[in-house]
Amino acid sequence: MTDPVTLDGEGTIGEFDEKRAENAVRELLIAVGEDPDREGLRETPGRVARAYREIFAGLWQKPEDVLTTTFDIGHDEMVLVKDIEVLSSCEHHLVPFVGVAHVGYIPSTDGKITGLSKLARLVDVYARRPQVQERLTTQVADSLMEILEPRGVIVVVECEHMCMSMRGVRKPGAKTITSAVRGQLRDPATRNEAMSLIMAR
């Protein structure tokens, strides 16, 4: 499975240091020529630090923690959850990218499935961290394959990146689409079935 972003070899990262984050935001405001002590900005460093704790909460979560509930019901056909909201942050510019994810899988031979909300939570685990869309897509697919052991997985993510909309080429509305396909869903007929379900409105 693609390893999450880590700072050591144990698959974990450091604790969130709110005071250090607050000081860093204050320094950034000074660096861009602002006065962090003026009325409108006086509380901004603290607000941003607390917001980052929430926005990057996925750094302190593991995919297996959200896929703990499974059911053996003998279902052997595709399960697909569409239009899962994606709210993430580009690790290159620390600005948002937003959109939707479609996550589908063919259960294992014993029919083991997970709760539908768990697929949305899995997307959040990987979205709520400094991220790139390509890695996010792969991590969701690989986590499902490793933890649920399904016969196949498909993940399609479609997002607008503020680093393209607000700066650089400045093309609001441009969408990036990434996909990851594993197992039996690599079969053209099965993949086409999944894509037709994803594209149906």
Swiss-Prot record:
Gene expressing this chain: folE
Positions that bind Zn(2+): 90, 93, 163
Any one GO molecular function term: GTP cyclohydrolase I activity
EC category name: hydrolase
Protein's pathway: Cofactor biosynthesis; 7,8-dihydroneopterin triphosphate biosynthesis; 7,8-dihydroneopterin triphosphate from GTP: step 1/1
InterPro entries according to UniProt: GTP-CH-I_C/QueF (IPR043133), GTP-CH-I_N (IPR043134), GTP_CycHdrlase_I (IPR001474), GTP_CycHdrlase_I_CS (IPR018234), GTP_CycHdrlase_I_dom (IPR020602)
Entry protein name: GTP cyclohydrolase 1
Subunit composition and interactions: Toroid-shaped homodecamer, composed of two pentamers of five dimers.
Annotated SUPFAM superfamilies: Tetrahydrobiopterin biosynthesis enzymes-like
Highest taxon above the source species: Bacteria
Listed NCBIfam families: folE, PRK09347.1-2, PRK09347.1-3
Keyword Transmembrane: no
The protein's Enzyme Commission number: 3.5.4.16
Pfam families: GTP_cyclohydroI
UniProt key word RNA-binding: no
Transmembrane segments: none
